[in-house]
């Protein structure tokens, strides 16, 4: 374990003493440091009628237990404080450590003993993570140190778990959206699942916009998947034009219906544990699946601003600007009289994507988004540089396939009976509009590109993204983060994992940082919390997070690739082609081992190479035919210890998100030896070699200069490392699988790898 503590708010002595007193700690500025520490420790054992017993189970020195120490005349020293602090946080002498000083250095322990600062040390200790993954104060509250009185209690600028999660209100409302996406002449209704504490205080809301939450249709999804085996089409030379079109909602009328009291209820919905954490701290949770999902009406428009509007309508309702009904019969309306109107959205992948889309509307009431692994341009999710390009792990998927997966109205037999014919018509229109044949950008994709509206974002923004996420690739967050207005508060956590959540990782206090931010933004707490704009997980060692100023630098280093002419054959033998098509993982293994069709260049680094931004391959290339696709991957190659990309569970249920509520495992990325690490990758149709909107011809056997931008990253390579460049054509995971008989030739003497370099 290593501390990377970003959430602690430096506190004055007077404020620290006041907050400790509010928690019931009997500390006195006139007492000695030793007496105050003893009083603090005894309070920790509030379950015991006699605190001597648990105190005797701690050691103050290697030869003295804590009870004996406090009964002695010995003075409090750094050695004693450190040893007791470690034990209070759950670290066991002789098991987790033998030498406390060395262990504290390894932990990067954030508290440095000064006898005159004991009150502040105790305050800081309570806000510090235990071995279990919870802060000490959260651990104590979870054990019942504070009663669940359904009111707010704060410590170090963060809300504590004092809301009763055993008596939650679970209710359903149906919000009227200014849409008619299925064109049936009726405004669409949006189902909203609400979970909130029983409190007299107006509550802020965490909203998870999740098209998955009302169920998914995996059978329809699998039937809709496309075969990747097809020839790369030769496109006609042309210029692509699109236009920015404002989304115009339909008119709605003020509702004059009586207020209803009897709301639909529910017993369970699959929740997000970060939401659960905040539910216990006085934040209502709502789950919304939007148009075209079970319980709602309309068509699944998948990514456009009509879908976004269906979530926006819910924020409007929370602020009194839209109508919600108690049921589909629309006999009674219901108002969000429990809400304070301020909303933060949460969730990963599609969920985070909807958060980004919502933010670009500038809707009043949306105070903050926490968007994890989020898409900012749907074209860049299903296409790349004029190519059909599947997200990592999902060959054959496209946006209409996702529509089939998430159009959960068809899971309700009655809805299927009444609406499936119309749904199939609209789905067919969507399939035609996305143009899987060419892979080109068009108006359909432009209408699903949130980057063009990034300037309208006015809420606070928190993004998390994995630099090993080849599903929602790093370009998605790179482009939206760098497009955000300079006037807003923005934060980015870049980790070394893949498409995963990070709120329950041991090495970073993400939950607590979000708590401090949300208390600021949604509860109006003046806590003086300041979070760095960008925090990056160091790839060279375990559990080390660093502040960074920018994602993408203008300083570059050009690396020569060699002097040879290298030939890349596109064609595989029939058996090999079929084998790779059945198992793209076998293809990846062969590719990285130098066995698949490829041109391979290894560069031994003579100095450190701190990459920050978008690597570009500038290549001199020619094709034997009038078509060609180019794929590239950059590897950190050779056996050494690296971070894994999937977090593993260190404990099974040590994190309590409330008071015995929604327990979850503590996780972390492992650090272990492997043979290589993908740093970046990229794909291009050579007919789109100059830009996305220009379709050009490929002259047979004529040299072309190609600039292939790869996925942005921050990655530190060290002197002596090997940077492996792999150039090839068909990628069996991502691209169409064209087995036609053509070849590319690369002139390495006229080619370079252009690397953005991080400044010191």
UniProtKB/Swiss-Prot annotation:
Localisation per UniProt entry: Cytoplasm
The answer, when asked if Protease is one of the entry's keywords, is yes
Q: Known InterPro entries for this protein?
A: AB_hydrolase_fold, Galactose-bd-like_sf, Pept_S15_Xpro, PepX_N_dom, PepX_N_dom_sf, Xaa-Pro-like_dom, Xaa-Pro_dipept_C, Xaa-Pro_dipeptidyl-ppase/CocE
Q: Name the UniProt key words of this record, in alphabetical order.
A: Aminopeptidase, Cytoplasm, Hydrolase, Protease, Serine protease
Q: Can you cite an annotated GO cellular component?
A: cytoplasm
Which Enzyme Commission numbers does its entry carry?
Answer: 3.4.14.11
For biological process, the GO terms are: proteolysis
Q: Which reaction does it catalyse?
A: Hydrolyzes Xaa-Pro-|- bonds to release unblocked, N-terminal dipeptides from substrates including Ala-Pro-|-p-nitroanilide and (sequentially) Tyr-Pro-|-Phe-Pro-|-Gly-Pro-|-Ile
Gene3D superfamilies registered for this protein in UniProt: 1.10.246.70, alpha/beta hydrolase (3.40.50.1820), Galactose-binding domain-like (2.60.120.260)
- Residues at the active site: 349 (charge relay system), 469 (charge relay system), 499 (charge relay system)
Under the GO molecular function aspect, what terms does this record hold? aminopeptidase activity; dipeptidyl-peptidase activity; serine-type peptidase activity
Q: How does it assemble?
A: Homodimer.
HAMAP family the record matches: Aminopeptidase_S15
In which family does this protein belong, per the annotation? Belongs to the peptidase S15 family.
Q: Tell me, what does this protein do in biology?
A: Removes N-terminal dipeptides sequentially from polypeptides having unsubstituted N-termini provided that the penultimate residue is proline.
Q: What is this protein called?
A: Xaa-Pro dipeptidyl-peptidase
